[in-house]
Amino acid sequence: MTIDFYKMHGLGNDYVYVDLFAQKIEADWPELARQVSPRQFGVGSDGLILICPGQRSAVRMRIFNADGSEAQMCGNGLRCAARYAYEHGLLDGVLGELPEGLAAAAAGWALAGGKWRSAPIETGAGILTVALHVVEGNRVDQVGVDMGRPILEAARIPTTFSAEMVVAHPFDLPDGQVRMTCVSMGNPHAVIFTDRLDDVDLERIGPYIENHERFPERINVHFAKALGRDRVKVLTWERGSGRTMACGTGACAVAVAGGLEGRLDGAVVAELPGGELRLLWNRRDDHVYMLGPATIVFEGTWLGPV
């Protein structure tokens, strides 16, 4: 079997995208994710994303991590899937004006030229509304997303901490103790603020926290350093994928954690290894809004095993 695909990334958080509107195929998707993700022996990616017909919206996105596990949500992946779906006509008939919350966020983002269009996309975390900034040539240059309300109840993240909310909670590492805040943005995140970000041994500490017994579904891990009230630097270890260049839901979780800990204001720029994301935690509607790029790298055909 051959499978046509696109390689896309959001700030270096890259995935192989397969369009199941254009190709009516069935495959072992977890195994394909494991095959395409290695950078020496596959296409090279953080995982696999399927763009397919939705049950509750025109388009649905499914995400498989590099290890084959299925994820509920990926912010960078959603932006890329939204761009692909718009530019390939998959959102025709459902495009509309920006709803109130996204319109307010877009006004703050103040992008020059172009026009905004919105559409719903189905994910494992529910239906999310995307805002597409369309420029000359009907091309999407930036994508905003209404990421919804953060989940803060410990049991729903899920964690086994006894506290109702995990905010700046002590957490023991093999060589010391840190303060951790846990947030779900449709997937679970642990955020640790530190003034010594350059000293973090992410390859050692990341998997230790990811697989800790406190997190029954494992967890995404982020170390962050506040550079001011409106800017934060972030390093990410993703559940099922390891170190990545960026994590959209993780950046949203960092913005929320920074607000809960009193370190950050509502509007924040997150500095990630792959670039910058603009975030807004709007306390009026309790939604988190995200803006960032979605980049097409190349298209190809997979000839390997499935």
Sequence positions of predicted segments:
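Active-site donor-nucleotide binding/catalytic segment of nucleotide-sugar enzymes
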Residues: 183-185, 290
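Short, charged/polar, Gly/Pro-enriched secondary-structure boundary elements
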Residues: 151-155
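N-terminal, positively charged, Ser/Thr/Ala/Gly-biased leader segments
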Residues: 1-24, 145, 157-159, 163-183
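Glycine-centered secondary-structure boundary/capping sites
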Residues: 89, 156-158, 172, 262-263
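A glycine-rich beta-to-alpha transition motif near the start of alpha/beta enzyme domains, typified by
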Residues: 1-139, 190-306
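Selected transmembrane alpha-helices and immediately adjacent juxtamembrane segments
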Residues: 179-180, 188-191
